Structure formats: structure tokens, C-alpha cells
Amino acid sequence: MIIADINSIARAHGGRTIFSDLSWTIQDGEKIGLVGPNGIGKSTLLRTLAGLESPDAGAVVLRRGARVAYLPQEYAGEPRRAVLDELLAARDDLHTLEQRIAAAEARMGEPAVAADMAALERVLAEHERLLEQFAALGGPALHGRAESLLRDMGLPEEQWQQPMEVLSGGQRKLVGLARCLLADPDLLLLDEPDNHLDMERKTLLEQIIRAFDGAVVIISHDRYLLDETVGLIAEIEPAREQGARLLLWEGNYSAYVTQKELALLKQQQDYIAQQKEISQLEAAIARFKLWASIVVNERHIKQARNKQRQIDRMDKIERPVLERRRIALQFHPQQRGGAKAIDLRGVDKAFGDNIILLDARATIMNGERVGIVGANGAGKSVLLRMILGQLAPDPSSYRGRAEDAIWIGPSIQLGFYAQQHETLDMRKTPIEALRDVRPMYEGEAVAKLGRFLIPYAAAQQPIARLSGGEKSRVQLARLMLTGANCLLLDEPTNNLDIASAEVLEGALDEFAGTVVVVSHDRYFLDRVVDRIFEVRDGELYVYEGGYSYYAEQRARQLRPAEPTPARPPGDVKGKKPAPTTRTNGQ
């Protein structure tokens, strides 16, 4: 059954056509991933579906009585409203009914109504009708459902009466998702729902999407999430004449990538064959016209016209874009570096009573790729910044020799990518940002920025005015110019579209140095890292292998009972490291 019908809609902004004549039908129960490059119009289409924006032409028709819930990229809610009240506000219809029920009950106690049997019967009948309506809409269970959803989202009861403004970005996102679910929608629209979520919450999000009875449309750069939840990919891609067009692909994201590649190769073959046929027809037309001019033969003129009509009647095949323009990213270390890159020798770190790490020990060899994972607030970025030297280990570290607790190889040059773009001076232009790293002429800086898809106009603006994706690309361009042989990356795929994330994966795969990366992007971690460091409850656990192997090991551990942390590989002479170890000192 159709839940939403998009009929030939068009949208333009600032003189730029976003899409025109776009049509799409969404069926009940479909789980759809909406993909496409940044800036193509995905969020605009989602807001149009939600009724928050109106198309310039065409219409969006929803099934009669269908309810739609929309979760934006950044969900703030009412800053001063209590968390539980923020959820309950999703059902304004029930709140209105509660007010009407209360008003009817108040009228029953009025002397004039109590003295008039007919009036009292009318009020009682209205009260009964309102109660039935309230029950039919799930009113009596509303508070219980809201509380249950908050528990499912991992929000403790002591936070339910706190104002929204005190929550973290990830917690606000979960409240927004819970509010959407409480609204009992038939169509759920999610714009980057995994932003700010840690691994555990991403797994919860997957379970919620899979269990949801209605239709779901998700915008996400998380390929793992799209693989696990959707059965249809809706791709918005640039079109030559109409802004953007929508293509539908059956299956999850990985299936879409394979189908897309095969379809482009087939289109290329068909295009070449058609161009060959057109060339042959055009050559024949030229011959017939030449003969007609020599012998003045009407038959040759007719043959030329017939050949031209053949060409005109053809459904022209567009020349496929086999490789869309992508950022040009390559990391070339200036020097190779020694055998050992980083050594953690019993690192302690706490903020007040909150213990981040206690006697953390691990060795990272040159050329290794290490992924740091853990719940939000566990201390992943803290560990990265201690390695970088921006934070100092506590004085108790390394038996009181805190200054030696983190050893960096003498030939190791660190390069840092900051999650919040702190490496960038927001007052400077991208051109200045590149020239700060390496002396170069302005034209060379503009050319390098162009290879990172930063247009000339944006290259001359203060970085503060750039989009999140543009800031990320400027940061990557700067990092590339450093020539560092050990890259410390804090959530590098945030704000990158899938194409740019794939380029980053390829660049890191070819990089000859060491990589230490904090990320919640499971697909990215599986492609890039060969060891996992998990920060959990003040401990540092080491897992040999990529993210999928780590997730499998953790699942096994959690099924029976939590294992006792083991000693680090280096503490037991001659022993091979266990797949899962706690890097705890003796």
C-alpha cells in the first residue's frame, strides 16, 4: 500500500535548481536509504516529505490519515523543557484530549449542571466519548510508553526531569528518536540519526529501525547502518539538465554499490555501441548528400533524410560518469620512522572521581593501524590528546614518572585531525590555512583546495563560514601537507560524504606510516584498522583484528560473564598475545 506519493516536484534555492520533475512512491513498510553526495538535496527532499518545506512545483500526497515523524540532523528540542515532557509533547492530540476530559469533569461539579439532569447527561456522554477516544489513541499507556522508550534509549531516570539543554548531542538525538516513535508514525524520516551516537547506541538504532512496522527513509553516511537496516536504496545523483534525479536500487548499500558499478559498465557499453551506430549513420548521410549534390538525385536526398530521422528517433544514451569527481588525497610521510612508534607505559588519567585510564599499557609498532573505540565519554579522545601531548598523564603514571609514561619514537612525526576542527583558525581563509603548513604561492594553494572540492569563492572566505564537510576537507588537505608518518585521527569521517570517506580509506590503505584513529564508523574501521583498543571503565583492552572481529569477541564475552582483564602481551615473556587482553601492568 502506498504511504507517500511524490508527483513531479521541483525545488530551487538561490537560483540553483536542486531537483525538477522528481517522482517517487514510498510503500508501507519499506526501509529506504537515501544516498547521494553532500549538497545534492537529500535533506531538502526529506523536509519536503515531512511537510516542513513546500515544493516549487508538483505535490507530495500522503495516504489519508497517515502520520509522519521527522528527526533532523541536529535535534535540540525545547532547551528548558524537561526530557519526559519533550517526549509527551509528541502527542499534542492526547494532551488536548486530556484537557477536554479535565474540562468535562470540572463541568460535572458545577451546581448548575448538577441540578439539571439533561445537562448532566450531556456532560457525562461527552466525558465518556472523550475517554473512549483517549483510550483508542493509546492515551492511558502514554506515560508508560514514554518512560519505557527513555529506558530503551539508555537515559537514566534521574535525567527525565532535567532540561533538554543539559544533555549531550547524542542524548538529545536519542530523545528526538524516542519522541518520533511515541508519535506512532506510519512514515519515519531520519536525517543522519547516527550522528553523535557511540557503537552501543548505533546497534540500538539498528534494532529500532528493523523492528519498526511502518516505512522508514534514512539519510546516513554510515554504510554499516545502511547494510544492516534497509532493503532499498534511493540515490539522488546529478543530472545534466534537471538539477538531480532519483534512482532506485533493490537491496542494501553493499548490493547498491555492486549494482551501480555493473549498471554504469553496461551503460558505457551501450553508449559506445550507440555512438558507433550514430557515426555510421552520419557517414552514410554525408555520402548520400555528396552523391545528391553531384548527380542531383532525389532518391539520395530521401535516403539522407531517412538516416537523419533514424538518429532523431533514437533514445539517446547519456555518456555515463564512471567516476564522479572526488577529493585527491594521498599521504606521503617525509621519513620512515623507527620500528616502535608509541609506547604507553602505565598511563593514569582521571578527572575528579571519574577515572578514565588506570595503568594503561600498550605498544604501537610503526606501520600499525589502531582503532580506538568505547562509549561516549569513556576517554577515547582523551587518550588521543595525551599521545599528542595536549593533555598530560596524571602524576601517578608510570610509577610517578608521568613525563615518561607516553613514549613517542624520536623519528615519529605526529599529524592530528581534530573532531571539532580545532586545528583550524576559523578567522583565516582556507588559502591561509594551507600556506601556514607549507610555504606556497596563492595559486598553488587554490589549486590544491580545488582538488579537495573547495571552490575558489569558498577558498577566499573565513573558514568559519564553510560547511562541516568543507572544514573537514580543508583539515585533510593540511594534514596531507604535513608529511607526518603517524596520523592521529579523531572521528575523521564525520561530515564526510560516503565518496570522500572511501577516498580517505584508500589513502590510509596506501599510507606507509602509522594510523591511530578514534571512530564510531564501523565500516571505516573494518576497512582501515588491524587492532582495536577499547577504553572501558578505566581499563584499556587490546583486540587483535578489525572491528568485526572485536565486535564478535565482545559479544562472546558478554554472553556468559565479563572476563577478568588479562596482563598485557609484553608482561609475559615468550607468550603470544591473546586475541583479547587488558593492557594492565604488573
Residue ranges, per PLM feature:
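Hydrophobic stripe of amphipathic alpha-helices that form coiled-coil interfaces
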Residues: 104, 111, 137, 144, ...
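Short acidic/polar alpha-helix capping motifs at helix-coil junctions
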Residues: 291-294, 468
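Short N-terminal helix-initiation segments at or just after the protein's N-terminus
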Residues: 9, 254, 286-292
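ABC ATP-binding cassette signature C-motif
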Residues: 1-272, 325-326, 330-586
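Intracellular alpha-helical coupling/juxtamembrane segments of multi-pass membrane proteins
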Residues: 260-288, 297-300, 304-314, 318
